[in-house]
Design a protein with these regions (language model features):
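N-terminal single-pass transmembrane signal-anchor helix
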Residues: 2-30
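Aliphatic-rich helix starts adjacent to a transmembrane/signal segment
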Residues: 19, 28-50
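Alpha-helix exit/C-cap motif
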Residues: 50-67, 80-86, 356-362, 410, ...
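Extracellular/periplasmic head regions of type IV pilus-like filament subunits
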Residues: 60-109, 406
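N-terminal module-boundary/linker segments of secreted carbohydrate-active enzymes
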Residues: 121-248, 262, 511
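Short aromatic-cysteine micro-motif
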Residues: 180, 184-187, 221-404
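Short, solvent-exposed loop/turn elements at domain surfaces
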Residues: 199-206, 283-289, 487-488
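C-terminal, surface-exposed recognition/capping segments
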Residues: 346-349, 380-382, 386-398, 404-512
Length: 512
């Protein structure tokens, strides 16, 4: 009996047929699997978006109210706050947890929000948080105008958010976009500093010491790397990196208010940003105190007619205690619900870092220009007509902050530990209103560590600037930016007493 089997020809034919079948079926199976993964990924993203919608309902007060404004919710925040089950939300193509963000965009034409999942989380600046008596404005047609529900800022295009305080908010509050806000009605201008994290290149890929990105010249530093973040993001990196890939991001101290005084970074103590006065604080040039040149003789703490505008006389000769108390009382004069206060050095540093970035005065990572100097010898804010002095702006255009370089030395609410008790206060101010430095060594001045984002040791000597830290008991305060009588830059700092002729101050507001 013969054994039956395949001949070689038959075997080759069968293998050929199987190969043809495989060529047909494998792509079909691969495509089917890919479609299944794409469907599963889409479903996972929908789960994330639904969780974001629930989150948004619980935090509705933080959502944007102007057309095109974007609120970013991190997927990690949804996990941390139990809106998502970490084990179930995975990328089916990698079997790893899905990260990224949900962008919540306000669409005014529909009166609702658009939710989109994205893998990128650092594209948009946090929406400005306004006090109910602050009026958002946009600069168009050579004037400040109401915004209605339209988009009014774009940090990616160096257009910073501006708001004003007017004598009568009801006159403008419900107007459509495009109505001029008269200068005579404005008493104060403010600029929004959105929350960000930063890192500074210390050495390039060639191992050379650098000052900002890829600059070996301390007199011409490169950009500071910045990414905008949400309030839930707390980056605790070193704030510097080696090589050409930014890493080790750090959230500046300015975006944290330790209300509990426990040195714990509680989520409820984080800020999505803060407002800084667009100009130094001033009086009308013909005010009796400005004319006499002796503000110390004025009851300035309760004085009306204090402005944060250009072409005003910067308030000087006042002394720290009066500056501090004037700043606190200014919010009452402006009918604000949120407290005004004297700017801290940490806030000055944050504004300076934003300026030294692609969102400020840098046209590329290796090409940044120093903030122009207000050299008005009469200490006039904005150098006079600020519209003609745009080089003095923190971002090179009219939406930025002025008087950071020149004008007056700006006294900050920042002191050496134990000194504030000796400044004449009957009761010490709340600790969130000042920086308490613990050492005369600026590299160890924040609890034996670097003061992150304060523009002290991290940017020492940039643009060839003068720098003197808090050195001794007789000169234990800290001023920034130089005045119109010297050639210091915005990066300059100087130890100071509490009553100096060329010291003024700037107002800050943190709206919760």
């Amino acid at each position: 009996m013969k054994n039956k089997g395949f001949t070689l020809v038959e075997l080759i034919s069968i293998l050929t047929i199987l190969g043809i079948i495989a060529l047909i079926t494998i792509p079909i199976m691969t495509k089917t699997i890919k479609k299944a993964e794409e469907k599963a990924l889409k479903e996972q993203k929908e789960v994330i978006i639904n969780a974001a919608k629930k989150y948004a309902l619980d935090y509705v007060s933080e959502l944007p109210i102007y057309d095109g404004d974007i609120y970013v919710i991190e997927v990690q925040e949804l996990r941390n706050s139990t809106y998502l089950d970490d084990e179930n939300i995975i990328d089916p193509t990698t079997d790893k947890p899905l990260n990224g963000c949900v962008n919540v965009t306000y669409v005014s034409s529909k009166g609702n929000y658009k939710y989109e999942y994205t893998e990128e989380c650092n594209t948009y600046a946090a929406s400005p948080v306004l006090d109910k008596n602050m009026l958002p404005v946009v600069y168009k047609n050579n004037r400040w105008e109401t915004i209605g529900n339209t988009k009014w800022y774009d940090y990616n295009n160096k257009e910073w958010a501006n708001a004003v305080i007017v004598k009568d908010i009801s006159k403008y509050k419900k107007l459509d976009a495009g109505v001029e806000v008269l200068d005579d009605d404005i008493v104060a201008h403010f600029v929004w500093i959105p929350r960000f994290s930063y890192t500074i290149q210390k050495k390039n890929a060639q191992g050379e010491v650098t000052y900002g990105y890829n600059s070996t010249n301390i007199n011409n530093p490169g950009s500071i790397d910045i990414k905008f973040t949400t309030k839930s993001t707390i980056d605790l990196g070193s704030g510097y990196y080696y090589g050409n890939t930014p890493s080790s991001y750090r959230t500046p101290d300015a975006f944290y208010q330790d209300v509990n005084q426990d040195n714990i970074l509680d989520p409820e103590e984080q800020l999505s940003g803060f407002w800084l006065g667009k100009f130094e604080t001033g009086y009308d040039q013909n005010h009796e105190c400005a004319v006499s040149g002796s503000f110390s003789n004025c009851d300035i703490e309760h004085e009306e007619g204090i402005y944060i505008k250009s072409n005003k006389s910067s308030i000087r000769f006042l002394g720290f205690k009066n500056m501090f108390e004037t700043a606190l009382n200014l919010g009452k004069n402006y009918n604000l619900e949120s407290p005004t206060r004297m700017m801290k050095n940490a806030e000055y540093g944050a504004a300076l870092y934003l300026s030294q970035s692609l969102f400020g005065r840098c046209t590329s990572k290796t090409s940044c220009t120093n903030i122009g100097m207000n050299n008005n010898s009469s200490f006039i804010t904005g150098g006079g007509d600020y519209k003609n002095n745009l080089n003095q702006s923190s971002n090179g255009n009219i939406t930025g902050i002025f008087d950071l370089s020149g004008g007056c030395w700006e006294m900050t609410s920042s002191f050496l530990d134990g000194i504030l008790e000796k400044t004449g206060f009957d009761e010490l101010p709340k600790a969130i209103y000042y920086d308490n430095y613990t050492s005369t060594d600026s590299s160890k001045a924040c609890n034996n560590d670097v003061c992150y984002g304060h523009a002290l040791s991290e940017t020492e000597g940039w643009f060839g600037t003068y720098r003197e830290f808090i050195l001794r008991e007789s000169r234990n305060g800290l001023t920034r930016g130089g005045d119109s009588l010297d050639s210091h830059t915005a990066f300059a700092s100087a130890a100071t007493g509490f009553f100096e002729n060329h010291d003024s101050f700037r107002i800050a507001i943190a709206v919760k």
